[in-house]
Amino acid sequence: MALEWAGSPSRLLSGIVNGRSQAACVQAVDEQTHQRRVCGNQSLTPALSLTIFQAMNAYIGRVVDLLEPNNNHFDNVSLEEARQRVLSGSPETVRAIEGSFALLACQGQMVRMARSMDRPMRYFLAKREDGPTLIVADRIDSLYAWLKSEGLEGQFHPSYTRMVPAHHVVELHLIGCPDPAPQYTRFFTPVRNRFSTDLDEIGRAYIGALADELAKWLRHVPEREPVGVCFSGGIDSGAVFLATYHVMGKLGLNLSRLKAFTLSLGDGPDLRQAREFLDRLGLGLFLEPIEAELSSLDAVETVRVVEDYKPLDVEAASMVLALGRGIRARYPQWKYLLDGDGGDENLKDYPIEENPELTIRSVVNNLMLYQEGWGVGKFKHSLTYSGGLSRSYTRTYAATRHHGFDGFSPFTRPGVIEVAEGIPFTELTGMSVPKLYALKGEVVARGIKALTGLDMPVFPKRRFQHGATRVEQLRRQMPDREAELRNEFLAMYS
């Protein structure tokens, strides 16, 4: 059910009415009808009556909160305390919230919103005769459905929606006309280059932070619930699986609850890699392949689910949907899934040569480039989508929720990102692209060794969608044409 708030304009009267008459002139808003009324006016001059009439006709800001409170998971605060922290607007106070969250808080005409990396959050500002209405949800189609229910769908276009960027408090004042301009306050600013060049030290810190986040998350999972890891045998999913295996053992949890789910579309290399990874460590019994047909991939369905059209993200989300569909068919009650999304972003392990906008200098020298894109206020920053993983996390979030899973990647947590940003990439790589690509395996393998004592196999990087099936097969099923995917998305609202 939507929660609604109406900002009473009674505060607008404060200071307009003189001390003698102020007590007798109170404007109220009926909580059910949102109708305005002025009570107790007995002796007003014409000038004062006009002033109060203008105040009475001031806009009433209205907020509709479509976010699901149960979708927030906090480690150290209650929901109400978390909202109060967002309301405060204090970056330090919001940064101290531990967990997954998408929150808004209101006071008067002011609205503040904030989210963690793994909880997409969107808003739309609708115009009504009595003032603006701010609608907030985790999905574009939820915003549209509410507008349609109110007969306001004529105002809607998906490009008019806005995404709350991760790691920022967004402040709006519902003043009616002109449209309010959002103000952004960063609440997470990791210190860059704070570590030495000792890879063992870096690995211990990085995987140690990963294990800490997994321990917090596992404590919220009911003790009889199974835990699945979306597993390819790559560096990130491998680290998540081995750290989870280790932490569950340390916490005295039953390891028979743990599975490594690997998607296979028939001819991809991931299943062989996953099997080799686990067999080398004597952990092959945890592997559970999930087979699917390549023909089951549907780019149009994926665009509808993730509400985005970037080809690489649509491909990756299609794999998550296929994996989730297979797990759900086999285990109708399964709920909890872990994955390694965000690991590439943290250790800057994307092919620079595939993006003509990037150089190794821009990748290494820009704070959280892969997590946030070029950044709020920058020329290329998208108000509709934000940037980086802040935008693309819907490939995991929306795809897992579509099949009823509660997913989590510890790589998205600030405590883990903070360690990654502290790595002195320039010193360690000498601005060499091959050295940058090799660094991730070195850091993670050393960290896993320090945490678990296991020698983690490290295989060459491969995207999820290129491991579940061969690239040429994928391309026949899902053409790499962004314009077509964008048109499919826009057609949903045409």
What are the residue ranges of the model-derived segments?
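Non-catalytic structural connector segments
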Residues: E482-E484
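ATP-dependent adenylate-handling active sites, centered on carboxylate activation for C-N bond formation
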Residues: A2-L3, S14, Q109-R112, V191-T452, ...
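A short alpha-helix-loop-beta-strand transition element characteristic
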Residues: G453-R462
